[in-house]
Every structure is written in structure tokens, then in C-alpha cells.
């Protein structure tokens, strides 16, 4: 990718066609789709610029070359990254991609913690996401209507199917075609392979639990690179397990590796970094958004950018915070909030429940590389038969690996024999852990704190969310079922785990959804089926805030497809003169 410098601006008198707020997975896609359709677009990012390749300062660095051997100084982590350090991807190699919690706080009730994992820089969390990429199905889009939890989705799978294909081909998704109704097939590159233990487990599982099936997880890593990916400057995955540090090979999908170069190539994109969007500018005479108010993150100076369309892609809670802060006489509780549901129905996937254990045999088997995905069991609960204790469902994911030399840390020994022992691979282990659907509930909400402000003078976001009874019963079933499956598969010394909310608060699945949901009725939803605000027709929200429920699959691929579809609709509406 060419240098970003020529495309970065501060102030601009120009009226753009579209302002895109945010530069992560959805912001990158919006910039690509809009510029390729001929629109002059401004991408506004609150964080610093990050160049592809040279900006990945932790990439290719072995732990012993780092000042703290790959770990973050304990005092720094506690004082500045108390929340971010809970993320699996946070370490000395990646710290620069995570928010400083001391500088960018938020609030929660004292007895209801929420862990908000954030990455405010150009590229957002697309630089360190887990890359699991799954289509949703009508089982998910029809669930609210059928069981009465949440509002009916205004779209169905058929509305998104061509857009799933569109984004899959460009992003590059590795996976296998399985013919499962609960998990539709897509436009896939070859799947990664099972290791010997996983293959044996798959055969036993598929035979016992059909129609449920163990498949290889679908991931936005290039198992092979097509001509389209080569044209983006990307090559196949090197299986280094360093994805969250940034990848100079462009082997996994990110804004920097994929959508941003495509947008810049058009010549129609400009980027405003270190620009914190305070609010959306609204004209009550025309009932239109006319731009955004911005605070410079470095100088505290204020400025405005103007456009014909405003598209919020600032993350679920980021976009909702902007809308809540965009108050006027017409919208005293937040822009486009005539329904009163803005900020409500927050969800995050249910996690941290499962089981693992020791596998006997396979001493002569090993594996090559560090595959970026693993075995995956798509949803099987409440697909045909109704579970007596809870509604909706979950997936199980995991894998098999061999213990390494670190396992010898607690073993006795010394000298030549001890060294020889730790050179040998340890025992095989196999585990499965759940990811389930949290029900949308009005009381799970975010709001602006009435008195507390950040260092830029903006109200802190206040997050109040808890798991409900259905959520907890599902998590219990995740752990019980994972242990039951492992026992049938012959795994020994099984350890069942299920964390409490204090140990593993909501938010740590890093799949926040809802708070500006789409729906059919403007009285009960913020957006229509094209991610367009019911109240303000030239305002769009295409990130996780738009979701009417959270399903059980990782949501990023659906965010991409929705964004591409919304952009096409926005362009059509502009050309028709309706917005």
C-alpha cells in the first residue's frame, strides 16, 4: 500500500459526498464501496495513523528481543490497561493497538462490570481481530419473530446472500462447503487441515452426533491467494500465529491490507486521523445530517466536516455514543431516537464455558506450523428439538495440540536427562469451548454519564449489562455438553470450566451488538433494513450497533456484508435525489 501521508488531512472546506466515521472492518468496507462507486469520501478516525507493514512494530520480534520478553510491565498493565489486558491478544507485541484505559475511561455500575476492548487507530480492531468468518442463516434472522425476544429483523438471509459472496471473494475466507442449513456455505478458499488427533475426533463425533458435525473453522486468512488477492499485494498465510501483531504479508483481512488500498486507488478518499467525532451536525429545516463536529485528539481544537451523507462505522458502542451526544430540540435524547430504543438491547456473545482434557496415544504424530483456526461444531441446540431449559443456541470451538517444553516447568529433574526430556513433545490435549447467543433485553443499555467527562470534555459512556437467566442456563449447558462430548471421544482427566461474571465479564467476547437496532417499525427501532435511520434518511449506521440480535456466530462477516449492501443503497438513494 502506498504511503498514507498524501491522503491525510486536517481541516477541509470541501463538502464531501459521504463522511465515514471509523476505519475498522465496517469503515474500511464503506470507504472501498463508496469510492469505487464514484463518491468523494472522508474517513474520520479518532486514533493515530498506522501504515501497513511499517506500523506493525511488534511483528517478527521474538520475545527475547523485547524489553519485557513479550509481557507488558505489570504496573503499566494495571495502571493504564486494566481492561485491555484481559484480552487474549494483549501483550508487549500488540499493546500499541489497544486503548489506554486511563486516558479513555468509561463507567459501569460497581457490581456489574463490563470489559470494553477497544483499538482506536487507523484500522481499528481489524488489525487484531480473531478472523472467524461465518454467514448467518434464517434460523438467526427469524428467531426474534418466532420466540418473541427482540424485534423482528427487517431482512432475511436472501437479502444478504449476494453481499456475503461479494465480501467473501474480496476478503478471502478459507473454509469448506458443508451443506449445513444452520451455517450457509460461501465463496471459500481451501480450508485449513485437521491434525491427526482432530481428524480422529471428527470421525467419532460425526458418527455419533449426526446431523451435528465437526468442521474446520472458517477464517479470513488466505490459505491460498487468488489473482484478486495478489492484486491487493497479499500472499498466502504463513501460519505464524502472529496475526494480532499485524501482518506485512497481508495474509489476513484487515483495513490496511485490503479495503483501504482499494479505496485509495480510486483517488476519491481522504482520511482525517486523530479526529474524535463529538456529534453529528443536524439541520432541522431539512431533516438531514450535514456533517460531523470533531475534536482534535492532539490539540483539543474543534472543527467541522461536511457531507451529503453521514455513515457511522465507529464500533457498536462508539457509534451509539456519537448518536447519544448528538442532541437537539428535535432529538433531545440523541439523534434519530424518536423510538426511545437508542442505547438499549446491548448484547455480547456468551463465552468462557467448556471443557478440555488429555488425549492418550498419537505419540508419533505432530503438526506443522501454527494454523490460524481450529475445529468448530456449529449450532445444534434448538435447531429441531427444543431444549427444555433455554432458547437459542451456541457453537463449540477448540482443537488439539501437544504440550511443549513449558510443561516441564513443574516437573522435577536436572542436567542431561532433564534436558533430553524437555526436548520431547508433551501429551496431546483436546478442548471445546462454547460461544452462545445472548438474548436482547431492553435493560441492557448504554447511556451518557450525567457528570463524568473524558479529557476532551465529552461525557463518559456508561455501560450497564448483565446476563439473564436464559444466558446463564445456556452457559451451563455449554460446559456440560463439552465435557460429555469429550468423554465420549475418549479424552481423559477432563476439566470442566465455567467462569462467573466477575471472572469473565460481558464484553470479553468482543462481539458487542445492538444499541441502535434495525427493525420494521420506526416506533421500536432506530434503523431500517438498509441500516438507514428511520428519522434522518441520510444517516446510516452499519456496524454492530445495527444488530437486532447477536445470533451465535462471529459477526464480522455479517457486518461486512451489511455495510456493502448499505453503501449500494446509499448511492442509489443519492442518485435518485431522495437523500
PLM features per residue range, with description:
Residues 215-223, 240-243, 272, 278-282, ...:
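A glycine-rich dinucleotide-binding beta-alpha-beta segment and adjacent secondary-structure elements
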Residues 95-125, 129-130, 135, 148, ...:
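FAD cofactor-binding and catalytic pocket of flavoenzymes
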Residues 67-100, 104-115, 120-121, 129-135, ...:
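Conserved redox-cofactor binding core of oxidoreductases
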Residues 36, 40-70, 249, 266, ...:
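Glycine-rich loop(s) and the adjacent beta-strand/alpha-helix scaffold that form part
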Residues 549-567:
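A conserved FAD-binding loop/helix module that cradles the flavin
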Residues 1-15:
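A short, basic/flexible loop-to-alpha-helix module at the beginning of a structural domain
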Residues 18-43:
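N-terminal Rossmann-like FAD-binding beta1-loop-alpha1 element of flavoenzymes
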Residues 20, 24-25, 196, 317, ...:
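Residue-level detector of alpha-helix initiation sites
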Amino acid at each position: 500500500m502506498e504511503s498514507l501521508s498524501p491522503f491525510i488531512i486536517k481541516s477541509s472546506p470541501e463538502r464531501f459526498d459521504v463522511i465515514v466515521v471509523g476505519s475498522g472492518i465496517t469503515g474500511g468496507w464503506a470507504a472501498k464501496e463508496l469510492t469505487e462507486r464514484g463518491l468523494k469520501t472522508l474517513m474520520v478516525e479518532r486514533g493515530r495513523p498506522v501504515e501497513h507493514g511499517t506500523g506493525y512494530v511488534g511483528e517478527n520480534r521474538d520475545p527475547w528481543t523485547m524489553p519485557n520478553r513479550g509481557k507488558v510491565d505489570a504496573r503499566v498493565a494495571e495502571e493504564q490497561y486494566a481492561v485491555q489486558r484481559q484480552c487474549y491478544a494483549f501483550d508487549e507485541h500488540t499493546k500499541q493497538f489497544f486503548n489506554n484505559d486511563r486516558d479513555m475511561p468509561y463507567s459501569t455500575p460497581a457490581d456489574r462490570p463490563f470489559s470494553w476492548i477497544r483499538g482506536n487507530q487507523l484500522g481499528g480492531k481489524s488489525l487484531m481481530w480473531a478472523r472467524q468468518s461465518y454467514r448467518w442463516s434464517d434460523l438467526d434472522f427469524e428467531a426474534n419473530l418466532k420466540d418473541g425476544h427482540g424485534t423482528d429483523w427487517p431482512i432475511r438471509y436472501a437479502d444478504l446472500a449476494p453481499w456475503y459472496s461479494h465480501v467473501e471473494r474480496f476478503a478471502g475466507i478459507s473454509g469448506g462447503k458443508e451443506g449445513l442449513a444452520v451455517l450457509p456455505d460461501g465463496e471459500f478458499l481451501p480450508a485449513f487441515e485437521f491434525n491427526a488427533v482432530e481428524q480422529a475426533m471428527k470421525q467419532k463425533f460425526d458418527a455419533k452426533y449426526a446431523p451435528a458435525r465437526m468442521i474446520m473453522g472458517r477464517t479470513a486468512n488466505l490459505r491460498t491467494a487468488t489473482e484478486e488477492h495478489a492484486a491487493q499485494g497479499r500472499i498466502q498465510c504463513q501460519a505464524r500465529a502472529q496475526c494480532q501483531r499485524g501482518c506485512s504479508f497481508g495474509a489476513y483481512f484487515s483495513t490496511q491490507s485490503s479495503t483501504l488500498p482499494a479505496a485509495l486507488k480510486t483517488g476519491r478518499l481522504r482520511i482525517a486521523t486523530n479526529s474524535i467525532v463529538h456529534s453529528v451536525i443536524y439541520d432541522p429545516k431539512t431533516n438531514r445530517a450535514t456533517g460531523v463536529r470533531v475534536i482534535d485528539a492532539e490539540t483539543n481544537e474543534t472543527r467541522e466536516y461536511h457531507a451529503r451523507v453521514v455513515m457511522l462505522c465507529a464500533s457498536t458502542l462508539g457509534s451509539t455514543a456519537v448518536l447519544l451526544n448528538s442532541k437537539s430540540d428535535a432529538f433531545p435524547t440523541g439523534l434519530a431516537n424518536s423510538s426511545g430504543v437508542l442505547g438499549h438491547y446491548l448484547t455480547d456473545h456468551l463465552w468462557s464455558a467448556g471443557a478440555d482434557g488429555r488425549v492418550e496415544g498419537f505419540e508419533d504424530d505432530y503438526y506443522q506450523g501454527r494454523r490460524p483456526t481450529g475445529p468448530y461444531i456449529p449450532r445444534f441446540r434448538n435447531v429441531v428439538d427444543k431444549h427444555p431449559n433455554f432458547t437459542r443456541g451456541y457453537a463449540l470451538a477448540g482443537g488439539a495440540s501437544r504440550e511443549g517444553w513449558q510443561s516441564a516447568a513443574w516437573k522435577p529433574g536436572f542436567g542431561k536427562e532433564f534436558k533430553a526430556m524437555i526436548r520431547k513433545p508433551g501429551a496431546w490435549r483436546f478442548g471445546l469451548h462454547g460461544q452462545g447467543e445472548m438474548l436482547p433485553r431492553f435493560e441492557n443499555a448504554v447511556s451518557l454519564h450525567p457528570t463524568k467527562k473524558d479529557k476532551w470534555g465529552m461525557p463518559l459512556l456508561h455501560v450497564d449489562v448483565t446476563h439473564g437467566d436464559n444466558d446463564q442456563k445456556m452457559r451451563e449447558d455449554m460446559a456440560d455438553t463439552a465435557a460429555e462430548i469429550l468423554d465420549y471421544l475418549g479424552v481423559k482427566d477432563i476439566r470442566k470450566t465455567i467462569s462467573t461474571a466477575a471472572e469473565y465479564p460481558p464484553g470479553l467476547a468482543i462481539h458487542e451488538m445492538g444499541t441502535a437496532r434495525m427493525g420494521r417499525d420506526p416506533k421500536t427501532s432506530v434503523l431500517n433494513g438498509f441500516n438507514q435511520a428511520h428519522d434522518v434518511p441520510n444517516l446510516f449506521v452499519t456496524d454492530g450497533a445495527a444488530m437486532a440480535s447477536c445470533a451465535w456466530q462471529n459477526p464480522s462477516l455479517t457486518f461486512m456484508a451489511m455495510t456493502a449492501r448499505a453503501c449500494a443503497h446509499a448511492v442509489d438513494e443519492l442518485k435518485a435525489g431522495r437523500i
